[in-house]
Amino acid sequence: MTIPTTVSVDPTDSRPADAPAPVKAWRPPMGWNSWDSYGTTITEQEVLDNARFMADHLKDAGWDTLVIDAGWFDPNAHAHGYSDGTPLCIDAYGRQIPDEQRFPSAADGKGFGPLADAVHRLGLKLGVHVMRGIPRQAVHENLPVKGTALHAQDVADTEHTCAWNHDNYGLKRGDAGAQAWYDAQVDLLASWGLDFLKVDDMQTPFFPEEIAVSYT
């Protein structure tokens, strides 16, 4: 992965002319994540309220990104817990879609598109949280993997799960079908105009193949 850099040259620099120029690292994203304040329960109106505050008070200082954390597809979301076993909001391919009770502008298949548009009009960016892997619900229903002849049970690794969030199974590392699943998921998120993804549960023990398959 290549990370772009910017180069700044100081005209008063007394170093030799052939010395490497100093390189400034890009700053990390600056913004706000909904988890600490809302857990899994944030609503569309609360996102917009925080976006307006950021636009009015923080944007000029470089704060420009809002991230909707875990549970945006959970119709039974509560505080900072997870609703193990509850039916989640997913599409025909098992990809998570927003809970329309909390995000009413997502109705009629619009997803986060209208909300992203509203945030963009404030000069800000919108992101969401996703877990590695594939929803267990998609696997139990053996839903198709979009763009392939495969189904969820063909690509899932049911032995490789998260210890603290039971929404997903892992995906078969290094498998073309797993890549197709991630591609389809990211295609949907990108179609909504999202700017940022927080990909969670990428922790020890690390599996380089699974990290690599997340790059789409």
Task: Please place each PLM-identified region on the residue numbering.
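Mature N-terminal, pre-catalytic/accessory segment of carbohydrate-active enzymes
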Residues: 1-35, 41
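N-terminal small/glycine-rich loop or linker at the start of catalytic domains
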Residues: 22-38, 155-170
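Hydrophobic alpha-helical membrane-insertion signals
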Residues: 33-54
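Conserved strand-to-helix beginnings and helix N-cap segments that scaffold or border functional pockets
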Residues: 44, 209-210
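Aromatic-lined carbohydrate-binding/catalytic grooves of carbohydrate-active enzymes
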Residues: 50, 54-118, 122-209
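Active-site core of glycosidic bond-cleaving carbohydrate-active enzymes
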Residues: 213
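Conserved small/polar residues in nucleotide/adenosyl-binding loops
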Residues: 216
